[in-house]
């Protein structure tokens, strides 16, 4: 019954399957999700579209957004900024659609400060051995890099206490179903619907 959409933040260690779970959620017909497109100062790659893959802006424009407190979260990688613009998220939420952010733990903590009423879900592997296996199967990292990723994963798992829910990604369909149940329940929380019922009784 809530008119305003809900902000859903999904994060977890590298290799846990955040992107795969996010894509499965968007393909499902459970709810009308909107995946928040990030903003970046890097140049578009062949085939990328502005407003679809990223919002491509200049460094000056991005830094102006930061100065105006217009970013939900941001970080700088290899001389380029990446982040989540607040205005697009707010516009979508006001339209009544849920917004899904798939971001790293550091970014999620920035979002938590600005949007404490969001739903923060931490995606976990069944165990660290399985996480290591998934990273190794990618075939993109050497052993030293994998070890660093595993150490970072342990640090990120320690941050789980800052989230509302922990969901094990053992199988993609199972993880998606668990997240959908969380979202369904969150939409029924009294603080999200109380205004609707007050209007019903004329208050």
From Swiss-Prot:
| PROSITE patterns listed in its UniProt record | GUANYLATE_KINASE_1 (PS00856), GUANYLATE_KINASE_2 (PS50052)
Is the keyword Oxidoreductase in the record?
Answer: no
Q: Which EC number(s) does the record attach to this protein?
A: 2.7.4.8
Q: Which GO terms describe its cellular component?
A: cytosol
Question: Where is it located?
Answer: Cytoplasm
Gene Ontology molecular functions = ATP binding; guanylate kinase activity
- Main role? Essential for recycling GMP and indirectly, cGMP.
Q: Which NCBIfam families match?
A: guanyl_kin
According to UniProt, the name of this protein is Guanylate kinase
Q: Which organism is it from?
A: Latilactobacillus sakei subsp. sakei (strain 23K)
């Amino acid at each position: 019954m809530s008119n305003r959409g809900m902000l859903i933040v999904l994060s977890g260690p590298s290799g846990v399957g955040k992107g795969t779970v996010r894509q499965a959620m968007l393909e499902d017909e459970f709810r009308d999700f909107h995946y928040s497109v990030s903003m970046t100062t890097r140049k578009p790659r062949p085939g990328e579209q502005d407003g679809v893959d990223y919002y491509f802006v200049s460094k000056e424009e991005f830094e102006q957004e930061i100065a105006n407190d217009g970013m939900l979260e941001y970080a700088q990688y290899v001389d380029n900024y990446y982040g989540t613009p607040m205005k697009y998220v707010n516009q979508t939420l006001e339209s009544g659609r849920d917004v899904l952010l798939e971001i790293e733990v550091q970014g999620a903590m920035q979002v938590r400060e600005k949007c404490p009423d969001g739903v923060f879900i931490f995606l976990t592997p069944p165990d660290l051995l399985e996480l290591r296996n998934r990273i190794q199967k990618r075939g993109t990292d050497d052993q030293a890099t994998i070890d660093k990723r595993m150490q970072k994963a342990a640090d990120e798992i320690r941050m789980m206490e800052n989230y509302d829910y922990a969901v094990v990604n053992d199988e993609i369909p199972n993880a998606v179903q668990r997240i959908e149940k969380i979202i369904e329940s969150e939409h029924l929380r009294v603080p999200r619907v109380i205004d609707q019922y007050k209007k019903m009784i004329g208050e």
